Amino acid sequence: MGTGDPGGAPRLTHFDEHGNAAMVDVSAKAETERVATAEALVSMRPETFALIESGGIAKGDVLGVARIAGIMAAKRTADLIPLCHPLALSRVAVDFALLPDRPAVRIEATVTLKGRTGVEMEALTAVSVAALTLYDMCKAVDRGMTIGGIRLLHKSGGKSGTYRAGDEA
């Protein structure tokens, strides 16, 4: 949401004055360093986790393939989300934390750009597609895996400033 009226009342930015969907015009915005980090969690059976950890999944390197899928997805966000701007991203990093006590894999993506619009959707798309890829690679042994906890952890740059999950309360 942005503030579209003089009183500063929140409004959805992807709609014009008639309520029609519209891509936001960012041409007047200053180019600044934009960074966003998102996360997702894939929960699974302990046996599935052990196979991922040991590299025993028949399809191959689960985390390596999921990392590449997440990076590719971040670069293709504008093709997937209708009103996102196509962006020349500076950096996309996709990392994994193995959580044996849960058992789960936590996925984190950080996207960087010097530009006129944020990269939150690119980071969220990266973790989403990385999670879907992990599911695809492992579904032969565990169709009961769950994907959840997809959220923005941090964003900085631009007019709206810095956001950190948990700071909004």
Curated annotation (Swiss-Prot):
GO terms for biological process: Mo-molybdopterin cofactor biosynthetic process. One of its GO terms (molecular function) is cyclic pyranopterin monophosphate synthase activity. Substrate binds at L83, C84, H85, M121, E122. SUPFAM superfamilies: Molybdenum cofactor biosynthesis protein C, MoaC. Pathway: Cofactor biosynthesis; molybdopterin biosynthesis. It catalyses: (8S)-3',8-cyclo-7,8-dihydroguanosine 5'-triphosphate = cyclic pyranopterin phosphate + diphosphate. Its EC number is 4.6.1.17. It comes from the Bacteria. InterPro entries: MoaC (IPR023045), MoaC_bact/euk (IPR047594), MoaC_sf (IPR036522), MoCo_biosynth_MoaA/MoaC (IPR050105), Mopterin_CF_biosynth-C_dom (IPR002820). Keywords: Lyase, Molybdenum cofactor biosynthesis. The active site is at D136. It is an enzyme of class 4 (lyase). PANTHER family: CYCLIC PYRANOPTERIN MONOPHOSPHATE SYNTHASE, MOLYBDOPTERIN COFACTOR SYNTHESIS PROTEIN A. Catalyzes the conversion of (8S)-3',8-cyclo-7,8-dihydroguanosine 5'-triphosphate to cyclic pyranopterin monophosphate (cPMP). Homohexamer; trimer of dimers. This is Cyclic pyranopterin monophosphate synthase. It comes from Rhodospirillum centenum (strain ATCC 51521 / SW). The gene is moaC.
